[in-house]
From Swiss-Prot:
GO annotation, biological process: phospholipid biosynthetic process
Catalytic residue positions: 271
Subcellular location: Cytoplasm
GO cellular component: cytoplasm; plasma membrane
Coiled-coil blocks: none
Listed EC numbers: 2.7.1.-
Domain of life: Bacteria
Functional summary from the UniProt entry: Probably phosphorylates lipids; the in vivo substrate is unknown.
PROSITE patterns: DAGK
Protein name: Probable lipid kinase YegS
Cofactor note: Binds 1 Mg(2+) ion per subunit. Ca(2+) may be able to substitute.
Annotated residues for binding of ATP: 40, 66-72, 95
């Protein structure tokens, strides 16, 4: 096997007992690959390990976990200054793995690891909210956010992405739309939104294609708003992604401003952010990510 530069795997602490992963790493090490492993325990660990990775001179920092872990690692990478910033590799080990699935990362651990180490590094966009918090995949608001943030961890562990839908059906009687106003380049809308999706990536909530036209290297954010007076018909239309549905409003812009008369919550790659005013902007070519050659989210 050809020689490859060293990599550092930042592993979510929930995956430390993953025996197949341990075996895959040992096998690649036996084949001559240098793979450092660090385990996260609390918020801030990923940023410290990215700094350590730079001191070690590795070519790739691999995010081993779900969308939240990918978010933490990618955010730490774009905050690095100087040259020789490592590329991002992705090892999907979370509940839904929405970003990894949509960009075509293999499910098999050994194949995903090899791609993360030796795949072609391509410049991709990220998004930033209120000049502080970032997301690589999607910001979701309204119905979808309350479901994903409130779904019990045990239910997610047992059922994966389906758990979000089940929990949503159980909470139908308490869910209300969010009144807000959204502006962007050549875009303006105000009204009651049941679901808001602002995507750099395409899917969230365990596989739902909220922004099916999104690309991760086009310098744009895709917006989809689901409106309507009734939760269940709108949820069904969300699952079907019916392009002719009058309750679906779409837009594309390099930025969006959102204002609400009351506090609303957005879910940024799994992390909630609450407020009444949000400025969301794209950060073009913010980092390099090792992706498969047939990645469907590249233009």
């Amino acid at each position: 096997m050809a020689e490859f530069p060293a990599s550092l795997l930042i592993l979510n602490g929930k995956s430390t007992d993953n025996l197949p992963l341990r075996e895959a790493i040992m096998l690649l090490r036996e084949e001559g690959m240098t793979i450092h492993v660090r385990v996260t325990w609390e918020k801030g660990d990923a940023a410290r390990y990215v700094e350590e990775a730079r001191k070690l001179g590795v070519a790739t920092v691999i995010a081993g976990g779900g969308d939240g872990t990918i978010n933490e690692v990618s955010t730490a990478l774009i905050q690095c200054e100087g040259d020789d910033i490592p590329a991002l590799g992705i090892l999907p080990l979370g509940t839904a793995n929405d970003f990894a699935t949509s960009v075509g990362i293999p499910e098999a651990l050994d194949k995903a690891l090899k791609l993360a180490i030796a795949g072609n590094a391509i410049a991709i966009d990220m998004a930033q909210v209120n000049k502080q918090t970032c997301f690589i995949n999607m910001a979701t608001g309204g119905f979808g956010t309350r479901i994903t943030t409130e779904t019990p961890e045990k239910l997610k562990a047992a059922l994966g992405g389906v758990s979000y839908i089940i929990h949503g059906l159980m909470r139908m009687d308490t869910l209300q739309p969010d009144r807000c106003e959204i502006r962007g380049e050549n875009f303006h809308w105000q009204g009651d939104a049941l679901v808001i999706g602002i995507g750099n990536g395409r899917q969230a909530g365990g596989g739902q294609q909220l922004c099916p036209n999104a690309l991760i290297n086009d310098g744009l954010l895709q917006l989809r708003i689901f409106t309507g007076d009734e939760i269940i018909p709108t949820l069904v239309s969300t699952l079907k992604s019916d392009e002719d549905n009058p309750n679906i409003i779409e837009g594309a812009s390099s930025w969006f401003d959102i204002q609400a008369p009351h506090e609303i919550t957005f879910n940024l790659d799994g992390e909630p952010l609450s407020g009444q005013n949000f400025h969301i902007e794209i950060l073009p070519a913010a980092l390099r990510c090792r992706l498969p050659p047939d990645c469907p989210l590249l233009r």
